[in-house]
A protein has these predicted regions:
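N-terminal subdomain of nucleotide-sugar transferases
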Residues: 1-70, 419, 429-438
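Carbohydrate-associated surface elements
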Residues: 53, 186, 208
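A short helix/loop element that forms part of the nucleotide-sugar donor recognition site in Leloir-type
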Residues: 62-67, 215-228, 425
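Membrane-proximal helix-turn-helix segments that form the acceptor-binding/catalytic region
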Residues: 125, 129-133, 160-182
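Conserved donor-binding/catalytic core segment of Leloir-type glycosyltransferases
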Residues: 227-245, 251-254
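Nucleotide-sugar-dependent
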Residues: 245, 290, 297-306, 311-332, ...
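Nucleotide-activated donor-binding/catalytic signature segment of Leloir-type glycosyltransferases, i.e.
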Residues: 270, 275-302
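A short, well-ordered alpha-helix in the C-terminal region of glycosyltransferases
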Residues: 368, 375, 382-397, 406
Length: 438
């Protein structure tokens, strides 16, 4: 296979645990869309994928171990799922995936570049091993940073042996990468300050949204809103109800607004390990203005977002610089103001300020959150203006084409670097950053 003019195609391999036909959203869906776009739009690339035969949330019939997905060769490994309840089991499963991926890489033809994600956290070990054996460069796609997240959530002690061991390896993988991509400026800053990584080696590539699938429409036209009898000013949270989302803040704001602003309601549509605790608090505090609903299937997600007058997103301060909520672009595409309970330095805070598309609230300040909600509920013009700005931000800054173009530039620049060339200069030969990512 050649790239035209007799030049061979660049061979690229992505390593990630979950991939097409995974339909649970999040990072697996993003990476599947990215690979599909690159393969369709760039015939000079030959893209392979090494993944598992598992689905993140289900354990039904597993896909075939080998599949040609319209030109993308997918090799699926028969390994245990890494999303186990036990930390020890997750670690062992992740190491098993990394070992199997390493063996698969060494048995495959040579690649010009390897792309490796952070699921499972041990996946970069496979890319690092291939670099050591064959001098193949790799780009490290950091969506979630471990062990930092586990330490932030209290699952690991910062000074414990497991965390220190994992951090030592993380340091090696980051510094061994030809380039590292992150989802936001806050993550870039964390890698610079906590891992000593040179800023010039980090590329900010945001996750994207489908602005053609999520279209603005008035809340009153939402079937979800009609089915559930939602009236007045609806603040919607749609997503995982877990420990990292700090939904206690929204309950505190609901308690403050329950009597003074009866037209305001808070809708939490989702599931997760904190749902029962949140439901208990709603009942115990008699928060009649809070409605807990089940998550919706993917095809109903745009209609769910349309049910809101304002959207809500949050992230624990303990995860500042370690992750960026993947739903943010979707909320912007729905043309609703976004109320973000996030630290001041987070990527969401930067975008909201730059695009004037919502309100940033300090975590742990329910009074501030209640004030922001009341202000939006009483100012229809402000809501419409922020919603229009949100839609423009989604269309200009959070598109698949924009992010895929960054990845394509990254791939072509790194794959053409002779083994060891970047180490000699300490800088990559070129750096392409789309507008709006800095």
């Amino acid at each position: 296979m050649d790239r035209g003019g007799g030049r061979p195609r660049l061979r690229v391999c992505l390593i990630t645990e979950y991939f097409y036909p995974e339909d649970g959203g999040g990072t697996p869906a993003m990476l599947s869309e990215l690979v599909r776009f690159l393969a369709d739009q760039h015939p000079d690339l030959a893209v392979d994928v090494i993944t598992s035969r598992n689905f993140y949330r289900s354990s039904g019939a597993r896909p075939a171990p080998l599949e040609n997905w319209d030109g993308v060769l997918i090799r699926r490994l028969s390994v245990p799922r890494s999303n186990r309840p036990s930390t020890a089991l997750r670690l062992l499963a992740g190491l098993g995936f990394a070992a199997a991926a390493t063996a698969r890489l060494l048995l495959s033809h040579r690649y010009d570049l390897v792309l490796v994600g952070t699921n499972p956290p041990a996946a970069p070990a496979a890319a690092a091993a291939l670099k050591w054996v064959r001098k193949t460069p790799y780009a490290y796609l950091v969506h979630d940073l471990y062990p930092d997240i586990a330490v932030g959530l209290g699952a690991l002690r910062a000074d414990g042996a497991v965390a220190r061991f994992a951090r030592w390896w993380q340091q090696r993988w980051l510094h061994g990468a030809a380039r590292v991509t992150v989802l936001g400026r806050c993550m870039r800053n964390h890698l610079v300050t906590s891992y000593g990584l040179g800023e010039h080696r980090i590329e900010v590539v945001p996750n994207w949204t489908d602005v053609d699938a999520i279209l603005p429409k008035p809340p009153q036209e939402s079937g979800f809103r009609k089915r559930h009898g939602l009236r007045g000013f609806v603040v919607l949270y749609a997503g995982n109800i877990g420990d990292s989302q700090r939904l206690e803040d929204i309950l505190g704001a609901a308690a403050l607004l329950r009597d003074s602003h009866p037209q305001v309601s808070f809708v939490l549509a989702g599931d997760g390990n904190a749902r029962d605790r949140i439901a208990s608090q709603v009942a115990g505090r008699n928060l009649r203005n809070v409605v807990l609903l089940a998550p919706v299937p993917p095809q109903d997600y745009p209609d769910l977002l349309a049910a809101a007058d304002a959207s809500f997103v949050s992230l624990s301060p303990a995860l500042d610089g370690l992750a960026v909520p993947s739903k943010f672009g979707n909320l912007l595409a729905a043309a609703r103001p976004v109320i973000a309970v996030v630290p001041d330095a987070s990527e969401l805070s930067h975008v909201i300020s730059e695009a004037e598309c919502g309100v940033q609230v300090t975590p742990g300040e329910p009074q501030q959150l209640a004030f922001a909600v009341a202000r939006l509920a009483e100012a229809e013009g402000l809501c419409h203006r922020m919603g229009a700005n949100a839609r423009r931000a989604a269309a200009s800054r959070f598109t698949l084409r924009g992010s895929a173009d960054q990845y394509y530039q990254l791939i072509t620049s790194l794959a053409r670097v002779p083994a060891g060339a970047e180490g000699r200069s300490g800088r990559p030969p070129s750096r392409h950053v789309s507008p709006g990512t800095q």
